[in-house]
Structure formats: C-alpha cells, structure tokens
Amino acid sequence: MKDVFSTVIFIMKEEKRMKKKILSAALLSVLVSSALGIVTAGAVYEMDEVSVTADREGDVAALPGGLVNQTAKLGILGNKSVMDIPYSEMSMTEKTLETFSDPSQPLANVLQNNPSIRSSTSSPMYTDFSMRGINMNGNHMMLNGIPSLFYQFNGPPNHIIERMDITSGPNAGVNGVSMSNNGTNSGATPAPGTINIVTKKAGLTPVLNYTQTFSGRSSFGEFIDVSRRTGANSEWGVRVMGEYMDGDLALRHAEKEEKNIFINLDRKGETSVTNIFAGSFDLRVNKGQRWFTYGGRSDVLPSAPDSNTDYDFDGTTKWMHGWLLTVNHEKELNGNWSWFVNWGVNRRSGNKYNSSSALKFDEKGNFMSSNVSNAQNEIGTNSYFQTGIKGKFHTGAVEHHMSLAVDRSGAKYWNDTNNSVKGNIIGNLYDGTAYTNSFYIPQLRKAKLSWSEINTGITLA
C-alpha cells in the first residue's frame, strides 16, 4: 500500500514539472516573437539598384534561324507582329540576303524565297518579278516607306538592306497614294501587295567591314560598311555603305559596272526618332537582254538552247545614274499618341541602246520577229510627303489602334526614243540572232517632257 502511494505522489510531481516546462516554453516563445517583431518593424533595408530592360512594342526581332522577323512595318500603322497583320506577311532579314543573294544579280532572286513571288526575267537589265501572278519591278518597291524611288532598270542594292517587309494582299489602304506611271504595271501599290525596303542603321556595336566578291565569269566587287554611334546615350548613329563592281556576268558577253555610296544618319531621343538616308548610284549593263515569246504550236516545244548563246546585237547597253533621299521622323505626343512625317525625293537620268521588244520563236526554235533598234534618253524625278498621327484608345475593355495620314506624291518624266527602220530578225535559239542592215544604232536626242503627275490622298486605318 505504501509503494502504491509513493508511486502516485511521484506521478503527480512529474505532472507538475511538465506543466512548468510547457509554461516556460510558451512564455519564451512569446518573448522571442515580440523581440523579432520589434526588430523587423524598426529596421531599414536598402536594396541594390535593379535595371529592367525590355523591347518596346513593335520593335523588330528575328525568329529562330534568323531568316525572318516576327514583326514587320505595315504602312502608316507602323511595326506590328506578323500574327496581328491581316495579310500574308514575311519580313526577310539581312541574314536572308547574305545567304541567298548574288551581288551581280537583281534582288528578285532573293524575293522569290517568298511563296507569293516569282522572278520573271533572267536579264540583268531589269528588276522584273511577279507577285501572285501580277508583273512588278523596282518601281513597286518602297524605301523606308517612301514609294517610287526605284525603277524597272535599277532596284535597291543588296548591301544597304537591313530587312524587306513583304505584304501579300491588297493593302494600298494603309500605304497612301502612289504614282500611276510605274513601268510594267501602274501604281506602286498594286493589288498583289507591297515590298518595303528598310535600310541599315548603326547598331550599338561599331562596324568596320571591307568585303570582296567574285561572281559570274569575271565580276569582281568591293564593298565597304562603316558604322558608329555617339552621344551621351549613343543617341546619334551614322552608317556609310559603298560598292564598286565591274566585270563579265554569267551570260556570255554581258557586262555590269555598278558604283554607289549611301549614308544613313539616325537619332534616337527620349520622345522622338529620326532617320535620314541618302546616296548616289551609277549603273551600266552591256548586253544581257533576255525577252522571249513563243509563237509556235501549243503541243510542241523546241529543245532547250545552250545558255552561252548570244542574242544581243552589238552595242546593246543601258546606263542610269542619280541620287535619292528619304527622311522619317516620329514624335511621341503622350503615352498613347505620336506624330510622324515621311519625305522622299530622287532624280535619275540615263540612256540605252537596245532592241525594243521580245524575240518570238516557233516550235523549231527559229526566230520569227520583226523589230527595231532604238536609242532612248530619259530623265525622271519623284517626290513624296506624308504626315499624320497614330495611337490607341479604349472603349470599355477594348483597345483600338488608329492612324490618320495625309500624303502627296509628284513625278515628272522627260524622254526621247529614236527608232531605226523596222527590219526582220533571223536566226534561231541555237545559233543566236542575225540582224538585218536596218538594225543600226540611232543617234541620241535631247529628252523632252513626256508627262507629269501629282496625287494627293487621305488615309485612315
């Protein structure tokens, strides 16, 4: 009985000790928590400076592989994601040009990487191509958003191009007015679509490049590319690009000589962006005209000729020189709206001696053409001005993007074509052409004003 009583007393003492321990632990926890709370509330911490950078909406970035961009310029709407553009859109990068271009050949050889475009000439004398089956040429290209600064004979040199925004589909409503006299087809923005050439600008990394090329039979080219940025925040940039090329092309007896120099000056301020591009060019192509039409039976075709065959008469040549200038400026008015101005002007002159139309042949490859040789002297000027506003606003939860622009384009063209007496062209696809005595080189005459044109428009998009 005594042992049982002792055991009970021991258990009661142990319970008292446990309660004291639990009470002590609880009090200690409260005191520690209070102390920590006081330290946390009273301390001041200074974090290291954190810089956050991001691409502004609409900036251009290449997709994986580097051949096409994920954004493109859509007329007065500016740079947009290709997923937000309601047309078939492709923006080819500088890498695409470096991969697929031949400096001695027209730009159409690169453009045909777009499924909407096919090259429609093998002649270095022309920039012809087709988009969705409609013939186009250098006249239909835009330069930094300015239309009609290139021609059927000369297009933009490959080495000045940063990217090419190709919009397939009827999008004249976002590009403003254009000239109706533009070579193969009228209008710089016809139904098939538009091609906007964006020139190279100075990047943050300085560039000093000298490049040599060899193509064709003996065409040797030299290129320079120099760029720098300066200013307290690298806001000013300058890039100089030049080319000299001379030699024989892949087509036998065809020669090309090209000289040009261009400069791109840009400024990126806190609330405005300005870009100025200017340069001069001089291009001559001797021989190399390739225009053929088939006039034989529809169920028979002649065998393919040797590509070395010469189809030009002696003295065939085409030459053009001139200059151009574009100015683009955009000023941010507030967080939602901005004002923009686009202006461009050019002047070119040149002459040519060539046969005036295509060589027609039958199912045996024999030529069946009558034609004339001609001497043409031409001068042309184009000008363009556009100003407007663009921005965004909300109606409830819906965000709207809108642009309003007024533009005016003008052009003048002086021309004189002196034709020889009409004569027959004999020969065939395999032995070449034989021209009658009437195919002589006529004398060049002074160009006269042929036409002038002014267009004004308002664009809301």
What is each of the regions a protein language model found here?
Residues 207-209, 214-294, 315-332:
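Transmembrane beta-barrel wall of Gram-negative outer-membrane proteins
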Residues 252, 275-311, 350-359, 369, ...:
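Outer-membrane beta-barrel and related beta-rich outer-membrane complex signature
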Residues 119, 128-130, 146-176:
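Short acidic/polar hinge/loop motifs at secondary-structure boundaries
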